[in-house]
Amino acid sequence: QPHGYGPTRFLRKDFVEEISAALRENDEIWMSEIFYAGGTAVKDISANDLIEDIKAKGKKAYFVEDRNDFLNEVKSSLSNNSVLLLMGARDPSLEEFCKELYEKL
């Protein structure tokens, strides 16, 4: 979950380059929409823009508009030896979301 529209816009190229370089052949990245903490942000970028850029580099990248749909979307990609790493910034609900996801797995 990217953090903030301004930082995502500013760091877009770096995010795409670094994430693409880190992903191995069978790795996947799933991303939900940018976390909006309020204020007067210009919402002219989406996490889907990052996903499309990463896909263009030949990587397995997926956008989930509503993170509550994430588990249903990702289930078919998970196996017994999968590693699922959830990351986000400044979203106070992320911890609870992770706990709920773990319980459902």
Predicted features, each with a name:
Residues Q1-L105:
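ATP-dependent carboxylate-amine ligase
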